[in-house]
């Protein structure tokens, strides 16, 4: 059971919206269902989804246990950047989901890892996310670290918590960014009305900082590098859109129609990943090579600008 004490910032907010912000991995419809089924109480009494919170309300939430399907190992090739007895660092391809979820119970990175590693994956995140300590979006490519044991998982989780992991992405964005470098410092949280999106305009956003640097300009497009100080869901996509430069191909935060035919999702690649190794204590860094589609797109943009 989880308990929340309502402060002045949340006063007057609908309870279903408030809880959707607290449980970012749950949909609003799921939250409304558990409220209807009596799993949510305010001051020890059941409420309806449209209940308006009052200052100092005590909210109790008991999440019902979900029946999780069996995850089947699948012989899916992995692009391995580094591997030892504690961790495996891979270059994730486009269109691959990191872990199983409704609608994606096969073909995920976890299915591939279970085949490659067998039982050598940490169990801290449960049977649906063995070894997974962080993730990137389905259409984002690049470097990820997976933990083979709980000791490694705890070490990497702590590094994520204190923002000591080095994460550098490259992206192509709409528009000509005038300054050569800059920082976006804007809290990121669940969008107030569209639960599938994140936003910089929300009541309970969490601190999010992205440092960007221009690598190349192509007139109407800019090739940039982004270094994360924090790692919120969709952080780079939301931050760049918030300053008027959404990622090319990102139909969620940018234009609905992509000018480049065949481009699937945002043009975003997790190039560099640097960690403190959980056993040796030494700094370890991998660099994931750009995927073919990204290289071809850069060549195309260079040719257009000649």
Which positions does each model-derived feature cover?
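Active-site flanking residues adjacent to catalytic metal/cofactor-binding acidic residues
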Residues: 90, 238, 249
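Thr-Gly-centered strand-to-loop micro-motif
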Residues: 42-43, 99-100, 147, 198-199, ...
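RNA pseudouridine synthases
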Residues: 1-183, 187-189, 293-301
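Conserved hydrophobic positions within beta-strands
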Residues: 80, 173, 211-214, 247
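The conserved catalytic core of RNA pseudouridine synthases
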Residues: 126-158, 166, 170, 185, ...
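Short, surface-exposed loop/helix-turn segments at secondary-structure junctions
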Residues: 199, 249-262
């Amino acid at each position: 059971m989880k308990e929340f004490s309502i402060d002045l910032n949340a006063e007057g907010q609908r309870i279903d919206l408030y809880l959707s912000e607290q449980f970012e991995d749950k949909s609003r419809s799921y939250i409304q269902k558990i409220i209807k089924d009596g799993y949510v109480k305010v001051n020890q009494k059941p409420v309806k989804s449209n209940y308006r919170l009052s200052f100092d309300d005590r909210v109790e939430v008991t999440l019902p246990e979900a029946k999780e399907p069996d995850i089947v190992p699948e012989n899916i090739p992995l692009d391995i950047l580094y591997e030892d007895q504690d961790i495996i660092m891979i270059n994730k391809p486009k269109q691959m989901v990191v872990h199983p979820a409704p609608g994606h119970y096969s073909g995920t990175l976890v299915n591939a890892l279970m085949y490659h590693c067998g039982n050598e994956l940490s169990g801290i995140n449960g049977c649906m996310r063995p070894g997974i300590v962080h993730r990137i979006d389905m259409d984002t490519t690049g470097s990820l670290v997976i933990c083979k044991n709980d000791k490694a998982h705890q070490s990497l989780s702590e590094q994520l918590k204190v923002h000591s992991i080095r994460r550098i992405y490259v992206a192509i964005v709409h528009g000509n960014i005038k300054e050569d470098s800059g920082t976006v410092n804007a809290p990121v949280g669940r969008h107030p009305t569209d639960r599938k999106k994140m936003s910089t305009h929300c009541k309970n956003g969490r601190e999010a900082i992205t440092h960007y640097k221009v690598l190349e300009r192509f007139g109407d497009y800019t090739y940039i590098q982004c270094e994360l100080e924090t790692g919120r869901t969709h952080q780079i996509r939301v931050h760049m859109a918030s300053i008027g430069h959404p990622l090319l191909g990102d139909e969620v935060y940018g234009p609905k129609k992509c000018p480049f035919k065949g481009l699937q999702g945002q043009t975003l690649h997790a190039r560099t990943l640097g960690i403190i190794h959980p056993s040796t204590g030494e700094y370890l860094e991998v660099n994931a090579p750009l995927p073919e589609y990204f290289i071809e797109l850069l060549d195309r943009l260079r040719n257009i600008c000649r």
